[in-house]
Amino acid sequence: MRGEVRLQSFTEVPQAISAYGPLSDASGKKSFSIASLRLVKNAVFVARIEGVTTREAAEALTNLSLYVSREALPPPEEEEFYLADLIGLDAFVADADGKEVLFGRIADVLNFGGGDILEIAPSDGGETRLLPFTRQVVPRIDLTARRVLVVPPEEVEAQEPPEKDAGGDEPSP
């Protein structure tokens, strides 16, 4: 295991991760070239990174997210997009009258293994909201206008912070 790292690929064809050229960190300042790639299961690989020759150097890369250069990716097909294109889009909801009102802005697209999740920073501040990225929850995406329409599930809409009663932390009789 000297100098090898575990790598999870989120590319459309997981094995193609090494064909996209050097990967970079989030800042774009450090680049990493894959010297070899060995499939473990699904989209998880053991990779040897050029210049990483010791266990300590490999451990220094733990939890580091690596990115493919946008220029290395093929252009999306008609009606397709990259998930990264969603970050920064305004998210709107329809009010009771059908008028679209700003809900927040997409801060990130997450995936913990059960499907893509949109992290939305609310327009009124507060904690971000997580919404499943499904056609039912996100029925309309307009990349040109830089906006999406979201229909939050009832569970999300019902989440209100608990109110503290004026009497403090003691239960009332």
Curated annotation (Swiss-Prot):
Domain notes from UniProt: The PRC barrel domain binds ribosomal protein uS19.
Known function: An accessory protein needed during the final step in the assembly of 30S ribosomal subunit, possibly for assembly of the head region. Essential for efficient processing of 16S rRNA. May be needed both before and after RbfA during the maturation of 16S rRNA. It has affinity for free ribosomal 30S subunits but not for 70S ribosomes.
SUPFAM superfamilies: PRC-barrel domain, Translation proteins
InterPro entries: PRC_barrel-like_sf, PRC_RimM, RimM, RimM_N, RimM_N_sf, Transl_B-barrel_sf
Cited HAMAP family: Ribosome_mat_RimM (MF_00014)
GO biological process annotation, one example: ribosomal small subunit biogenesis
Every PRC barrel domain range: 78-157
Compartments where located: Cytoplasm
Record-level GO cellular component terms: cytoplasm; ribosome
The protein's name: Ribosome maturation factor RimM
Superkingdom field: Bacteria
Protein family membership: Belongs to the RimM family.
Keywords: Chaperone, Cytoplasm, Ribosome biogenesis, rRNA processing
Source species of the chain: Beijerinckia indica subsp. indica (strain ATCC 9039 / DSM 1715 / NCIMB 8712)
Subunit-level organization: Binds ribosomal protein uS19.
Primary subcellular site in the record, as a coarse category: cytoplasm
GO molecular function: ribosome binding
Region (Disordered): 152-173
